[in-house]
Swiss-Prot record:
Reactions this protein catalyses: (8S)-3',8-cyclo-7,8-dihydroguanosine 5'-triphosphate = cyclic pyranopterin phosphate + diphosphate
Biological process, per Gene Ontology: Mo-molybdopterin cofactor biosynthetic process
Lyase found in the keyword field: yes
Organism, scientific name: Nostoc sp. (strain PCC 7120 / SAG 25.82 / UTEX 2576)
Protein name (record): Cyclic pyranopterin monophosphate synthase
Described function: Catalyzes the conversion of (8S)-3',8-cyclo-7,8-dihydroguanosine 5'-triphosphate to cyclic pyranopterin monophosphate (cPMP).
Amino acids binding substrate: 83-85, 121-122
CDD domains referenced in this protein's UniProt entry, alphabetically: MoaC_PE
Lineage: Bacteria, Bacillati, Cyanobacteriota, Cyanophyceae, Nostocales
Amino acid sequence: MQAPFPKNSANLTHLDGQGQAQMVDVSDKAQTIRQAVAAAQVRMLPATLEAIQAGNTPKGDVLATARLAGIMAAKQTANLIPLCHPLPLQKVAVEITPDPQLPGYQIQATVKTKAETGVEMEALTAVSIAALTLYDMAKALEKSMQIESIRLVSKTGGKSGDYFPPAP
């Protein structure tokens, strides 16, 4: 059974005239500098945080592996999310910072391109996969870790302008 076609679909660029999903044609758009920042957090027991910080983990360097996984994931976004355009990425930076107050880690990804469309999904994919990899690398220490608050922190450039949501 097909979902009902939205009545206000005239402005929904990912739907064709019959309400079917389509990849948006961006060929007429100008290439501009675009940047997006996304964040996530991984909550864990204080002992797990301490073990990761000390390098006492069975799988090796948790943070380096998670950071690289996030970078690699940003580059694969168009292969993972059906209607995303493959984009040339000029920058992907993933930062993973310990947060003893959480306790756990704060993850932030910054992605930059010069293209016809934005890199929000690339930044969100980067933090998501970095968080999943951190979990995978440390699950032998704790299976109750929680991945939380995956969100867009900011985006700049493009037709829709800059976006800075209120703090959570």
